[in-house]
From Swiss-Prot:
Homotetramer. This is tRNA U34 carboxymethyltransferase. Its EC number is 2.5.1.-. It comes from the Bacteria. Catalyzes carboxymethyl transfer from carboxy-S-adenosyl-L-methionine (Cx-SAM) to 5-hydroxyuridine (ho5U) to form 5-carboxymethoxyuridine (cmo5U) at position 34 in tRNAs. It comes from Helicobacter pylori (strain G27).
């Protein structure tokens, strides 16, 4: 949890926080008020925080949401830190949080998506984190290509995406929705993802972890509006989504942009 012990009027502070719902990423604690977000993002962070050193590196978080991971990255001493997310609400959440958790104003927040990286950030970063974005892209290869070109030579990508459990080079393409999400297009096997990444130009593809999403990590709280994981799974068989697909399984990966291609 990210904690700020500065003192504020608790009633006014809570009103501001609740006006910014839903809180997807967190948790945070400000002046003893806990923002109990839908996702316990510390679980994912613990899986990727030591994937590669961030000290004195130029680092990006593509799909940064409200900045939870950016604030955690600050603790590792990067040279600079840029977050990318086109969402309007999550930027407002970041602007609310930044005075508490980025008091030196080191983070740059860009309202851009992965497809916009080439406009300003070609060959710009030593490390890019892209967590929970790829399966939302209609063209995952184009997204990977954009990430590749945004990295410096010998730069590293830390990637998290939904995957399917299969030894084959295949991807699930949901018919209409996946776990009630309309914007999920391709969920690859690890082998298929490795092929995509290598086709774009990445090398040294490494599996950091594979983990099922559980209610410990994603659940309904007073700080979101609407449903969460428990509502997206088959009521009689939690190994399946409501649509009959396998329940969410996430893979965490690291790869390198090589010196030559």
């Amino acid at each position: 949890m990210l904690i700020c012990n500065d003192k504020f009027n608790p009633k006014t502070l809570l009103e501001e926080i609740m006006a910014l719902r839903p809180w997807r990423k967190g948790p945070f604690e400000i002046s003893q008020i806990k923002i109990d977000s839908e996702w316990d993002s510390s679980i994912k962070w613990d899986l990727v925080k030591n994937a590669t050193p961030l000290k004195d590196k130029v680092v990006a978080d593509v799909g940064c949401n409200n900045g939870y991971y950016l604030f955690k990255m600050l603790e590792h001493g990067p040279k600079s830190l840029v977050g990318f997310d086109p969402g309007v609400l999550v930027k407002k959440q970041f602007e609310f949080l930044a005075p508490f958790f980025d008091k030196e104003k080191k983070i740059i927040y860009e309202s851009l998506g992965v497809e916009d990286l080439h406009e300003k950030y070609s060959n710009a970063f030593d490390v890019i984190f892209c967590l929970g974005v790829l399966y939302h892209r209609k063209s995952p290869l184009e997204a990977l290509k954009a990430l590749y070109h945004a990295l410096k030579i010998r730069g590293e990508l830390v990637l998290d995406t939904l995957i399917i459990d299969s030894p084959l080079d295949i991807a699930l393409c949901p018919k209409k929705t996946y776990a009630k999400m309309k914007n999920v297009y391709f969920i690859p096997s690890v082998s298929a993802l490795k092929g995509w990444c290598e086709r774009v130009g990445f090398e040294n593809f490494e599996v950091l972890s594979v983990l099922k999403t559980t209610p410990k990590e994603q659940r309904k709280t007073d700080f979101i509006l609407g449903q969460s994981l428990e509502d997206f799974l088959d009521k009689t068989d939690h190994s399946k989504t409501l649509e009959g697909y396998d329940a969410p399984l996430r893979g965490y990966f690291k790869m390198l942009k090589p010196s030559k291609r």
